[in-house]
């Protein structure tokens, strides 16, 4: 099995290193990842300046672009083959609920799915640097084997969130729905020494709704969460109501 790995934390991130080491047990591993931190870039694609790729080891490339760029460049140029699976991660921090819309990790897996390649996004749910990447990586190896054997439904990829716990403390994996986050974002408004305003976007607290069966509900109780995501963003529950609108 030929495996393409990427992430949004950068090519030298510990989560990516742990994943590459573990995945080597089941196939040939190739890494095409950003040369720097690219968290929260979403599904951004670089279109207005050229990309550059640097080979830092035989099968490892660093790209001065986004995770989506890395998947595109890897599959269409840097590799001489189409990978059997793409795995994005292991992200430092969870990708849960509505936050997946910001995630470069999740978007890289989505990009592979657009190309018809089975894909998994995986994150370690931690508030710090995380110490249990190896446990998460071991689970991804098992899951990748299942995906290789069973396949995935059309236009579907998996978003996996693993609690930052030793392997022996992790509870069994569960299939979950995408959860919901309560947004209470803050803007930090400051003035630099030259009198110019500058801003930081962010929030201290991530407040998720504890919805039964959701990704957050699972990981907050020590379970590994596996959420099937798909490319069609249509809200089918709203179609009937909207079709009753008088748009003439």
Swiss-Prot record:
Quick one: signal sequence residues? none
The GO molecular function terms of this record are: 3'-nucleotidase activity; 5'-nucleotidase activity; exopolyphosphatase activity; metal ion binding; nucleotide binding
Any one GO cellular component localisation term in the record? cytoplasm
Disulfide bridge partners, by residue number? none
Tell me the InterPro entries matching this sequence. SurE, SurE-like_Pase/nucleotidase, SurE-like_sf
Q: Keywords on this record?
A: Cytoplasm, Hydrolase, Metal-binding, Nucleotide-binding
What is the protein name given in its UniProt record?
A: 5'-nucleotidase SurE
Name the source organism: Geotalea uraniireducens (strain Rf4) (Geobacter uraniireducens)
Higher taxonomy: Bacteria, Pseudomonadati, Thermodesulfobacteriota, Desulfuromonadia, Geobacterales
């Amino acid at each position: 099995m030929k495996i393409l790995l990427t992430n949004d934390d950068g090519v030298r991130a510990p989560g990516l290193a742990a994943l590459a080491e573990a995945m080597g047990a089941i196939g040939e591993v190739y890494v095409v990842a950003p040369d720097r931190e690219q968290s929260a870039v979403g599904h951004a694609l670089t279109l207005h300046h050229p990309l550059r790729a640097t080979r830092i080891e035989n099968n490892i490339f660093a790209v001065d672009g986004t995770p989506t760029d890395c998947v595109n460049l890897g599959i269409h140029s840097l590799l001489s083959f189409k990978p059997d699976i793409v795995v994005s991660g292991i992200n430092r921090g969870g990708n849960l609920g509505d936050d997946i819309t910001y995630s470069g990790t999740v978007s890289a897996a989505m990009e592979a799915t657009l190309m018809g390649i089975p894909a998994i996004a995986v994150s370690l749910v931690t508030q710090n640097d995380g110490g249990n990447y190896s446990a998460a990586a071991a689970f991804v190896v098992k899951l990748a084997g299942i995906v290789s054997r069973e396949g995935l439904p059309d236009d579907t990829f998996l978003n996996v969130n693993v609690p930052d716990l030793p392997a022996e403390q992790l509870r069994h994996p569960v299939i979950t729905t995408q959860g919901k986050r309560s947004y209470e974002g803050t803007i930090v408004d400051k003035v630099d020494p030259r009198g110019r305003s500058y801003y930081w976007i962010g929030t201290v607290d991530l407040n998720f709704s504890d919805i039964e069966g959701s990704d957050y509900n699972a990981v907050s109780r020590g379970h590994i969460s596996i959420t099937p995501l798909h490319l069609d963003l249509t809200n089918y529950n709203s179609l009937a109501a909207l079709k009753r609108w008088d748009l003439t």
